[in-house]
Amino acid sequence: MCLSNVYLDEKKQDKLVIEEASQVIVDDANVHVQTIFGESKNLEGYYVSEVNLMENYVILRKK
């Protein structure tokens, strides 16, 4: 199973939004992130800047 950590702006521990995200949904103005354990966060005004599937992380940035 490939789960990814989600960060704001850069891959640093203090920028970590959610660990082991199983789903990232993007709509016009929001990014919704959810784990397999049901934890979720909705980030308004962000976009997906980078997805690294080899290192299992996602970077979000403010629009």
Q: Where do the protein language model's features map onto the residues?
A:
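Compact, glycine-rich, soluble single-domain proteins
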Residues: 2-63
